[in-house]
Amino acid sequence: MRVLGIETSCDETGIAIFDDQKGILSHQLYSQVKLHADYGGVVPELASRDHVRKTIPLIQAALQEAGLDKDGIDGIAYTAGPGLVGAILVGATIGRSLAMAWNKPAIAVHHMEGHLLAPMLEERAPEFPFVALLVSGGHSMLVRVDGIGSYQLLGESIDDAAGEAFDKTAKLMGLDYPGGPLLSRLAEKGTTGRFHFPRPMTDRPGLDMSFSGLKTFAANTIAANGDDEQTRADIARAFEDAVVDTLAIKCRRALKETGLKRLVVAGGVSANRHLRAQLAELMESLKGKVFYPRTEYCTDNGAMIAYAGMQRLKAGVFEPLAVKAVPRWPLDTLDPV
């Protein structure tokens, strides 16, 4: 069985084909980074228009890469939310239209479920149950996962997501868009301990997170200490240390509360090397295991959507004729399969 996956929830157009016996047969990805760079962030209208231009050519390229035509596809999965509603509608409309034209089932996929399941594409895949840390530009949450669709929200960011805080702080430091990865690179040149940022919400019980205050703290630190290259690197290091420490503390608590020994980390920020190293140390100390998707599946992509869609299609879960697009969609409202 093969599923075509379509991802257009923000500023990446991702198309992939997943085979339940052979794995990923094709993977096409187009990033809009250059399009949005001059604006310092994603412009929703421009994102939607670019998805219109790129989605169908990438579908054609994915089919060609896999050596398939429409008869070789058993279902079409598309991101139905959460995300930018205009961008979502592009992929959802194309996916639903192709499903109708090709007489195939269409599967509406939750974007964050796609991220959560991305490590399942690896040879070393996690077994249920596990705790998932989902960290991206739009979301930061801890979830207990007992099976596909069986999700319990343990905690989430009450303001900025971790990735959003990275990008906003990078912008304050004059780094180009998208600034998060550039800030991390700058932090590698920094000295630990010169500056100390708070670890938000770690001095109280609970698993919710907050990162917006770190951006303000960074702005004040920059204003008070100048912006020579080494100072900027030291501030970047202090900021990254604060975010990573906070996430690690919350993961430790979540694992303790649930009694689980497996941790899945997914989403764009999961590619951060400092975060990976610290969580590896954490899980070693707990005699547990940590799982990640490969780097190319950390950011938005069609492979995770194709995989998630396959699991729901196998369970007989697919959409009626209507196009589904949900800009706000709590992960823990999904039905288990």
Curated annotation (Swiss-Prot):
Reactions it catalyzes: L-threonylcarbamoyladenylate + adenosine(37) in tRNA = N(6)-L-threonylcarbamoyladenosine(37) in tRNA + AMP + H(+)
* Gene Ontology molecular function, alphabetical: iron ion binding; N(6)-L-threonylcarbamoyladenine synthase activity
Q: Quick check: keyword Acyltransferase in the entry?
A: yes
Its required cofactor(s), as named, are:
Fe(2+)
Extract one GO BP annotation from the record. tRNA threonylcarbamoyladenosine modification
Q: Any idea which positions bind substrate? A: L134, V135, S136, G137, G138, D167, G180, N272
| Annotated Pfam families | TsaD (PF00814)
* Co-factor remark: Binds 1 Fe(2+) ion per subunit.
Query: What EC class is this?
Result: transferase
What Gene Ontology cellular component terms go with this record? cytoplasm
First and last residue of the signal peptide: none
- Assigned keywords, A-Z: Acyltransferase, Cytoplasm, Iron, Metal-binding, Transferase, tRNA processing
Key word Ion transport present:
no
EC code(s) of this entry: 2.3.1.234
Q: Where does it localize?
A: Cytoplasm
Q: Which residues bind Fe cation?
A: H111, H115, D300
Q: Which Gene3D superfamilies match?
A: 3.30.420.40
The domain of life is Bacteria
Give the family per the record.
Answer: Belongs to the KAE1 / TsaD family.
As for what it does, the entry says: Required for the formation of a threonylcarbamoyl group on adenosine at position 37 (t(6)A37) in tRNAs that read codons beginning with adenine. Is involved in the transfer of the threonylcarbamoyl moiety of threonylcarbamoyl-AMP (TC-AMP) to the N6 group of A37, together with TsaE and TsaB. TsaD likely plays a direct catalytic role in this reaction.
Protein's name in the database: tRNA N6-adenosine threonylcarbamoyltransferase
